Amino acid sequence: MRVPEPLGLKIYRTLSRAAEPVANFALRHRLQKGKEDPDRIDERRGIAKRPRPNGTLIWIHGASVGESLSVIPLVQRLRERRPDVNFLVTTGTVTSANLMAERLPEGAFHQYVPLDHPDFVSSFLDYWRPDAGIFVESEFWPNLILGARQKVPKMTLVNGRVSPGSFEDWKRQPNSIKFILSSFDAIIAQDYKNAERLTTLSGGVVGMFGNLKNAAPPLPADDNEVARLKEKIGDRPFWLAASTHPGEEEIALNTHQILRQDYPEILTIIAPRHPGRGAEICALADERSMQFAQRSVNGELTPETELYIADTLGELGIFYRLSDIAFVGGGITPKGGHNPLEPARLGAAILHGPHTFNFVETYNDMRAAGGAALVRNERELATAIRRLWHDAKTRETMIDAARGAAESNVDKILNDICDALLEKAPNKAGS
């Protein structure tokens, strides 16, 4: 039995309806900042230019690049199983839209998700009339979900995730989150911890088939650029600190200085989580009188370069292919960690900090397989890197274990999720 809509949600929806001028101002501001596509800005208001395809249409929503990467193999597998069905994929960022344009299979197409305004959402849903909706991970915009609840016959939350911080926030609004989650006919969590949190918040049954991100395709890379940089690096010992946050770059630079005592030709590559922080990392290197090159301003990697700052968007796949040792950030600073499957599938041994609540079971499985090691500070990080450089057999064993853990059960995860979803996908001959 569905619970009545809480007063707090009613107030939110009423205020958001009155805030259309604010929503339009926000869109204009984002457009000026380059965060919206000027040719497709109306999609953010729920206004489409392309026609709705005939027949069954399944809507899949993934907010950003990370969720988009998870969506691609899911859509591919669903299309294999149901070639008669079309798929509408929505995301909210320009980067993810570009990714969708490159990788979505035939029978699937992309639209920007409307802003969380009742009229924009209603316009979107009335135009596309999806026969089923699939939300990936944890974007719980009330107007979007509650609007879909009224107009989409079947709704499923897939790869559901609630961070510890969000869990504590939602526990202070139990009726609101329970009402939102009751919009879904089925909830499938990405791991046991998230299944427990979603069960607590929803008060219902939550399934768990494994993390859909395990099935995401490897990050793309320009093979010519990989070869060029590999030639530039030559035989120098080097390592990668990827997806780093403030505080972790200092640890990476301190690690570099520790290792330089034994490896004077060492090269450290830092790829910050947010590329716009490149200048900030340059300043840290300046403070240490380090020779550095900044990729975003075409800084050239030379034999004298001690630090290479990879502060460009969408190129992490290049550096994961280059380096066989990857420290994955977000775990020494308490950000919850980032996806270790990406470097593992591209041939890197994984080092990470203790705060990995976004990927708890993934890291646990990878450590249990011998593909990852936990480090808490620069001393432990330097020790781990030194050990892997010193012992090639240990390094190769760790790389193979990381790759094996990342690739295990991919087919099972996809098939289990597709089985659950296609039970809810109606057959329909016409539009």
Cite the ranges covered by each PLM segment.
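Catalytic binding pocket for nucleotide-activated donors in carbohydrate/polymer assembly enzymes
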Residues: 184, 200, 321-405
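Anionic-ligand-binding alpha/beta catalytic cores of soluble enzymes and soluble regulatory domains
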Residues: 240-250, 256-257, 266-288
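Acidic donor-binding loop of glycosyltransferase active sites
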Residues: 128-132, 305-335
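Structural alpha-helical scaffold elements that stabilize or flank donor/cofactor-binding regions
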Residues: 124-126, 180, 232, 301, ...
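A transmembrane-helix-recognition feature enriched in membrane-embedded lipid enzymes
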Residues: 2-40
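C-terminal alpha-helical cap of glycosyltransferases
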Residues: 408-431
